[in-house]
C-alpha cells in the first residue's frame, strides 16, 4: 500500500491536499515499478535455473530479513551453508567488474586474490547503485544466476564441498537452495582457492 508523504507547509488546506495526492501518486508509481523490476529479475533467475535442468528449492522470505545473518537467524538456516554474491569493481577507469561467491562465514580477499584475478591494481566492493545498474539486483538479493554473460564469476572452492548451499534469488524476497555442483555449469565461472579468508 502506498503512503502519502505529508509535508508541512504554510499553504491552505487545498494546496496541502493537492501536494499530498501528487506525492502519493509518485510513491505508488515507484512501488509499482519496483515490484515489476523484482518480478522480472526473479523470472530471469528461474529461467536460468530451469534451463540448467537441475533441482533447486525456492525459499520465499520477508525482504526485511534478506541480509544473510538476519535470514539465517530468522528462518533457522545454518550460516556456514549460506553464500553471498558480491560484485567487485576496479577503482580506476575504465571500470572492470566481476562477481564473487563466498561463504557467509568468510570474507572476500579483495585486496589480494580478487584484485589479482581481475588484473587490476586496486579493487573494492561495487556500490549498491553500480550493482543494480550492472545486474538489475539489489544488495541482499544478488545471485550468480542471470548475471551478464560476459561478467567473470569467481566461486570460493570451499563452497564446492558442501552438500547444499543457499544464495540470493535475484531479489531480496527470495533465496535459492541447491547443490554447489550446479554452479560449475554457469558460463564464465571459475572455482578459486583462497578467494576468501
Question: Predicted regions span which residues?
Answer:
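Extended, low-hydrophobicity, polar/charged segments
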Residues: 4, 18-197
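Short, strongly patterned local motifs
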Residues: 12-13
